[in-house]
Amino acid sequence: MAPKTPDASEIFHALAGNWTLVRDLGEVGQFTGDVTFHAADPDQPNVLRYREEGFLTRPDGKRFDGYREYDFVLHKDPAAIELLFRDPLSFGNRYVLLQFGEEGDAGESGLCARDIHPCGEDFYHHCMIWNGPDHFETKIKITGPKKDHLLHSIYRRAYHPERRDILS
């Protein structure tokens, strides 16, 4: 019997907790850091706050600290996870709406969700690949007159002694 394919709700609830992040930014460098998904408000169980913090290391060796925040909102109809910006310029605006259900591209395992975010004249082709409760990836291909590069992020569950249930 084939294993059950997780739905958006199962993926959403599995995100809660701490993760490590490695993001390849191509010629720009690499971002490494930590990510936390936590309940933003006890009265809104369908919202997880995402916060990443870490360092961008450029090819010339210079390092810069940085962070980013989103709200991940679980929707039931259609079953999806919506990412909302939290930065001051775009606060509350939709980044992408992820509906899981397709297989990953050739050479990828996992369940994939895709959406496109327009940003001025550029487009962010977002793909989230769910490999299980301890590992997921995002691939964001940015195209347009101002940008043309790929952001590949790998998320792995961070080890915490009090959460032995999430270890594999």
Please provide the spans of the model-predicted regions.
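Soluble ligand-binding/transfer domains with enclosed cavities or grooves
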Residues: 2-168
